[in-house]
């Protein structure tokens, strides 16, 4: 008696019935809604980082895997050039860049070993050296096959993430809010997003992405999947302020109280508005031009599209000054050659003006 289940047993139980636990949570919130404790029309969103118990030195980085995998493919290509011409031509064209699979490499190695074993015994010294070299090539092909399989497995585990921990493959390396050393060290963890109303948690979700900005829309969609509707009012801090999120809220008719990302910086007592920042330039909406601190008109010269990490396309209008030569404010304004060019994101500037 008095035996306690260890953490592995508890974790296995949670993994086995996680769908049922999620359904029970939803039913409890719906019961609170039926009793009038929450309305599900208002949601306060915030996030926090939860550190994993995984070892912080068990990281796997996407860039490292992709770089080493590319080097390995080059080694394989060079190695195949040494293989018997008939086998090389049968399996691949070494003059063309192609993707090899671990299975292909294992088959090449096996075929090469079979071809070597079928040869008759020879006493020719040069022929012996050639066969010995081919045997070595076959072993290296098999070795490269295993390594390529390992890299492919890393990429499959990574998915769309940039890192993961070997001892907790669901954890992603990210900077935590509590940084005792103050050196920005990344640790394995999770980005937990929580929605509340009336001090009750109404929704939650874990994300591998450390940036709150990129988790907001998926979190809103999880709310809709759970309750078959979106809240009519959203409240969130400046970590969620982005053009993509503002557009999402506007398109779905949601009343938003989401601060733009520079809101808290501008509220500091010592904050002084920089007149040379492009967003502080006077803008004539009717005639579509900006005015620099020197009073010179900056006419629109086109627009540029920027693709964000989430795939969202942001359009930015570009404006150029007519003549910056000899301007006494130029050293404070910009350091590039030619006339200054600025970009304006109309949606973000509109949101900043509201708040």
PLM features: residue spans?
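Anion-binding and metal-coordination hotspots
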Residues: 3-355
């Amino acid at each position: 008696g008095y035996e306690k289940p260890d953490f592995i047993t508890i974790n296995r139980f949670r993994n086995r019935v996680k769908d049922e636990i999620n359904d029970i949570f939803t039913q409890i919130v719906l019961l609170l809604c039926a009793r009038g404790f929450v309305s599900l029309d208002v949601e306060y969103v915030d996030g926090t980082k939860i550190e994993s118990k995984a070892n912080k030195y068990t990281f796997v980085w996407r860039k490292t895997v992709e770089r080493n995998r590319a080097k390995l493919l080059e080694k394989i290509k060079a190695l195949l050039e040494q293989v018997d011409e008939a086998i090389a031509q049968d399996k691949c064209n070494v003059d063309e860049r192609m993707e090899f699979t671990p299975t292909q490499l294992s088959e090449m190695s096996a075929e090469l070993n079979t071809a070597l074993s079928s040869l008759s015994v020879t006493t020719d010294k040069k022929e012996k050296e050639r066969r010995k070299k081919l045997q070595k090539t076959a072993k290296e092909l098999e070795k490269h096959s295993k390594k390529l399989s390992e890299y492919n497995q890393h990429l499959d585990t990574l998915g769309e993430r940039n890192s993961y921990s070997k001892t907790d493959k669901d954890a992603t390396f990210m900077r935590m809010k509590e940084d005792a050393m103050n050196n920005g060290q990344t640790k394995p963890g999770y980005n937990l997003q929580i929605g509340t109303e009336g001090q009750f948690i109404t929704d939650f979700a874990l994300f591998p992405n450390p940036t709150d900005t990129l988790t907001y829309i998926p979190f809103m969609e999880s709310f809709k999947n759970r309750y078959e509707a979106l809240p009519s009012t959203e409240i969130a801090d400046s970590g969620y302020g982005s053009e993509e999120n503002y557009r999402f809220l506007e398109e779905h008719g949601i009343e938003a109280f989401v601060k733009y990302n520079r809101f808290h910086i501008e509220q500091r007592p010592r904050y002084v508005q920089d007149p040379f920042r492009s967003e502080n330039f006077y803008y004539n909406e009717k005639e579509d031009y900006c005015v620099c601190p020197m009073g010179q008109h900056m006419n629109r010269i086109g627009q540029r599209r920027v693709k964000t990490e989430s795939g969202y396309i942001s359009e930015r209008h570009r404006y150029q000054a007519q003549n910056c030569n000899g301007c006494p404010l130029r050293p404070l304004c910009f350091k590039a050659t030619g006339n200054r060019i600025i970009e304006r994101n109309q949606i973000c500037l509109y949101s900043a003006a509201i708040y």
